[in-house]
């Protein structure tokens, strides 16, 4: 089973890396760039889980390891 955990900064949290990427895109001539927010994506392969247990295990992993829940949100998706 494949799953994805996407971690993003919460609204209102400053994102200096996103700002740097935004500036770099503009300096490269990419037009129409409004703002950029950076995040992390974890693609994880699991075995021995049904969908509900996989989601629960990944939410637990995100809470404890993958995301800093003070400043980040996360989304868990089971892909297949």
Task: Show which residues each predicted segment covers.
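Long, contiguous binding/interaction regions
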Residues: 2-43, 48-80
């Amino acid at each position: 089973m494949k799953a994805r955990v996407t971690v993003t900064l919460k609204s209102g949290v400053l994102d200096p890396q996103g700002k740097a990427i935004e500036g770099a895109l503009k300096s490269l001539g990419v037009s129409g760039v409004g703002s950029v927010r950076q995040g992390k994506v974890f693609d994880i392969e699991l075995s021995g889980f049904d969908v509900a247990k996989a989601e629960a295990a990944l939410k637990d992993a995100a809470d404890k390891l993958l995301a800093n829940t003070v400043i980040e949100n996360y989304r868990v998706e089971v892909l297949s």
